[in-house]
């Protein structure tokens, strides 16, 4: 299993809007992608930061999601609430408890 981790700096006062976009638009779009396993969102209200990570059956499924343009489309939906470009990393998931 592999995970894409995206760290965001959110504009002040926009965390709830970010969360609504995640729940109403981004997660449903992810659910339609082959190999998608789940999504977790975390927020730091004090510092206007968020982290979202999506889990995928394989590195190939994650890469296919990005190659299809899906990742870029979803990030574009967040443009009105982000304060800068998101930082993206990919990890192999080694322990799930």
Predicted regions and their residues:
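A common structural junction motif
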Residues: 72-74
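Short S/T/G/P-rich N-terminal loop/turn motif that feeds into the first structured element of a domain
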Residues: 1-53, 57-69, 80-97
């Amino acid at each position: 299993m592999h995970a894409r981790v995206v760290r965001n700096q959110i504009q002040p006062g926009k965390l709830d809007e970010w969360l609504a976009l995640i729940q109403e638009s981004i997660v449903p779009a992810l659910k339609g992608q082959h190999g998608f396993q789940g999504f977790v969102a975390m927020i730091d209200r004090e510092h206007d930061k968020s982290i979202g990570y999506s889990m995928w059956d394989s590195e190939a499924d994650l890469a296919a999601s990005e190659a299809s343009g899906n990742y870029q489309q979803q990030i574009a939906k967040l443009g009105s609430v982000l304060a800068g470009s998101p930082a993206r990393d990919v990890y192999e998931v080694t322990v799930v408890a």
